Amino acid sequence: MKKFLCLSLCIALLLAVLPSAAYAVETFTTSEEGIAFIKEFEDYRATPYEDNGKWYIGYGTLCEKGDYPNGISQDEAERLMRECVKVAEDLVNNLLLTYGIAVTQYQFDAMVDMAYNLGTQWMNPTYRFCSYLISGVGQYTEAQVVNAIATWCHQG
């Protein structure tokens, strides 16, 4: 599921990539379309489940194995997801502002989704995908960007 999601992110980023100069650097919040995207691909699970040795609940929110023994409602699942998305938003916004990276709402949503699903390790400037963002994705071929993102798709 995470590989499919990451492939979707690759497509989203590639379709939306425009020269950075076309946009002002600003802070964003995830759009309702971005939230719906996460919910659709994560799917709701009322009880904790294991995936790759980690435990999750609701819409893919990280938890501990013993958390939520009685499960959670969809409303609670969405609240938990939005709390985690807010953390991801702050981290992505910090990256963008620190390096003066201008993006579209669509690109921001994709990066928040990537941080939510795969973690934030990809935000390290020494890693290819982050270094491409910093120096301008437009300087690289689509194949190079896809390969840089694909590295992280195999992490989750």
Question: Where does each model-flagged region fall?
Answer:
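Active-site nucleophile-His-acid catalytic modules used for acyl/amide transfer and hydrolysis
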Residues: V87-T126
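Residue-level detector of buried hydrophobic side-chain packing
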Residues: I38, I57, M111-M114
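Bacterial N-terminal signal peptides
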Residues: S8-V17
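Long, amphipathic alpha-helical surface segments
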Residues: V25-N52, T61, K65-Y68, I72-E89, ...
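Sec-dependent signal peptide cleavage junction
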Residues: V17-E26
